[in-house]
């Protein structure tokens, strides 16, 4: 396939192969190419918005169908280069953290440096490399920060298929990877989607602590622990607080139970290595952080975006779910009066602690968490 730019003939098939090789050299584990036609995804997106499954993420409704129209983000766009990069660290310690209610569980994608800047920088370099090769090119990189349907694009580009938890799954890598896109104005040959591999499996749906996967491929964000601990700005609904357990930032349960994640690959990026203060952290220590400490520890981290107040809110809920101890109650009492939002969650947590003390309750793991820990420890999922 030949194409001319400024009278310079280009072999687009060869260029596509070059782009994939350049992407690998830049640290991406896979590179695919697709067109911009996402019309098939528009009805499901509209239905999801109509049901208010986006919760308080008003920007999703505000952008509406623009998410399914990449060419509106960069006029002249003909193709989308979709990439993925592994983020699973070598010492993820899923099971040991989840089963110890005195520790805080942080979704493993957030243990290291914020991925947005890293991936965007690599995508920009890829765009510049293509631009240099072609002599002229319009491009724009995206990393989970603009109104674009990155998962349908990744699926069309052959990076994997959409699992019933709505994440992209890959036969050789599971789902522990980030996605990114580079919009360009070249008519490159496109890749083909891969065959779906979930079959009748519904493990992700049944393991979800809050029942957020309301039907295959559909997540009600309002019930999702990741939404509740990251996106939700106000009070966490009381019904969900006991189900959150010790998860203080995000949740990985639907990924951890997935059989395909036995093939998950470790990251090569040092920036994604866990920060010491966030790896198997003690809840009481986390709750003692001042705002200055929080900002220092989370500098350059995705966690920083929720702010100190919501961080304390999340940790307060986890302390309410922890085994009874005088130390927990003392810690909770010590932060009363700092903010009405925090006070609400502190009062709830103290009530939970007192109930456990009065009933002499020893911490009992919820059945779903017990099952998940057993699955991880048996090695069905890599407990890196």
Swiss-Prot record:
The keyword Iron applies. NCBIfam families: tRNA epoxyqueuosine(34) reductase QueG (TIGR00276). GO terms for biological process: queuosine biosynthetic process; tRNA modification. The active site is at residue 144. Binds 2 [4Fe-4S] clusters per monomer. GO terms for molecular function: 4 iron, 4 sulfur cluster binding; epoxyqueuosine reductase activity; metal ion binding. Belongs to the QueG family. This is Epoxyqueuosine reductase. Monomer. Catalyzes the conversion of epoxyqueuosine (oQ) to queuosine (Q), which is a hypermodified base found in the wobble positions of tRNA(Asp), tRNA(Asn), tRNA(His) and tRNA(Tyr). Its EC number is 1.17.99.6. Keywords: 4Fe-4S, Cytoplasm, Iron, Iron-sulfur, Metal-binding, Oxidoreductase, Queuosine biosynthesis, tRNA processing. Disulfide bonds: none annotated. Its cofactor is cob(II)alamin; [4Fe-4S] cluster. It is found in: Cytoplasm. [4Fe-4S] cluster 2 binds at residues 208, 224, 251, 254. It catalyses: epoxyqueuosine(34) in tRNA + AH2 = queuosine(34) in tRNA + A + H2O. PROSITE patterns: 4FE4S_FER_1, 4FE4S_FER_2. [4Fe-4S] cluster 1 binds at residues 198, 201, 204, 258.
């Amino acid at each position: 396939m030949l194409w001319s730019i400024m009278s310079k003939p280009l072999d687009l098939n060869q260029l596509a192969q070059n782009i994939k090789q350049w992407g690998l050299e830049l640290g991406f584990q896979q590179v695919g190419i697709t067109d911009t036609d996402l019309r098939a995804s528009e009805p499901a997106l509209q239905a999801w918005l109509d049901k208010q499954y986006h919760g308080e993420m008003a920007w999703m409704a505000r952008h509406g169908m623009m998410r399914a129209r990449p060419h509106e983000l960069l006029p002249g766009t003909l193709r989308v280069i979709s990439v993925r990069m592994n983020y699973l660290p070598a010492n993820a310690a899923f099971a040991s953290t989840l089963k110890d209610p005195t520790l805080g569980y942080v979704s493993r994608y957030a243990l290291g440096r914020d991925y947005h800047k890293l991936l965007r920088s690599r995508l920009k370099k890829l765009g510049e490399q293509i631009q240099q090769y072609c002599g002229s090119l319009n491009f724009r990189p995206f990393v989970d920060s603009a109104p674009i349907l990155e998962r349908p694009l990744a699926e069309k580009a052959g990076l994997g298929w959409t699992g019933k938890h709505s994440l992209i799954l890959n036969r050789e890598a599971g789902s522990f990877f980030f996605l990114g896109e580079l919009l360009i104005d070249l008519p490159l040959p496109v890749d083909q989607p891969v065959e779906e591999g979930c079959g009748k499996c519904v493990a992700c749906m049944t393991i979800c602590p809050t029942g957020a996967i309301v039907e295959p491929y559909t997540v009600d964000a309002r019930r999702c622990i990741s939404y509740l601990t990251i996106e939700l700005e106000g009070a966490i609904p009381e019904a969900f607080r006991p189900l959150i357990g010790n998860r203080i930032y995000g949740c990985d349960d639907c990924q951890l139970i997935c059989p395909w994640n036995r093939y998950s690959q470790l990251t090569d990026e040092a920036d994604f290595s866990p920060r010491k203060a966030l790896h198997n952290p003690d809840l009481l220590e986390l709750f003692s952080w001042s705002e200055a400490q929080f900002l220092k520890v989370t500098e350059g981290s995705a966690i920083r975006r929720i702010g100190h107040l919501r961080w304390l809110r999340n940790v307060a809920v986890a302390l309410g779910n922890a085994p009874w101890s005088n130390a927990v109650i003392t810690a909770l009492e010590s932060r009363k009066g700092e903010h009405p939002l925090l006070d609400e969650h502190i009062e709830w947590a103290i009530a939970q602690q007192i109930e456990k003390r009065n009933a002499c309750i020893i911490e009992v793991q919820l059945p779903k968490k017990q099952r998940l820990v057993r699955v991880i420890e048996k090695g069905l999922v890599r407990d890196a």
